[in-house]
Design a protein with these regions (language model features):
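A structural micro-motif
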Residues: 1, 27-28, 76
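Conserved acidic segment of CheY-like receiver
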Residues: 1-12, 16-17, 51
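Alpha-helical interaction/dimerization surfaces of two-component signaling modules
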Residues: 15, 19-23, 42
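A generic structural motif
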Residues: 24-30, 46
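CheY-like receiver
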Residues: 40-41, 45-92
């Protein structure tokens, strides 16, 4: 399986990548992008199975990115992450 990590914070991306033994849970390839626009490009080209995505990012947020990918990758598993505690925003 392929995992795409989309987050505008490089430290977050590298921390998530280095903290988990991805191959032990069936992830063969870990891809990354630094915002929603680049995430769209990588997802369209590589067709990941799972997207681990920040909610708030410049240019295109994670929710908008996943909405645009919905028709192209209908079986994708999205997982959102956020450093914000704004519960109303996260509920959306």
């Amino acid at each position: 399986m392929k995992l795409l990590i989309v987050d505008d914070e490089e430290l977050t991306r590298t921390g998530v990548i280095s903290s988990i033994d991805w191959t032990s849970i069936g992830i063969d390839e870990v891809l990354q992008a630094d915002d929603g626009i680049n995430g769209l490009e990588v997802a369209r080209a590589k067709k990941p199975d799972i997207i681990l995505c920040d909610v708030r990012m410049p240019r295109l947020d994670g929710i908008q990115m996943l909405e645009r990918l919905e028709g192209l990758l209908p079986d994708i598993v999205p997982v959102f992450m956020s450093g914000y505690s704004d519960k109303e925003y996260l509920k959306a």
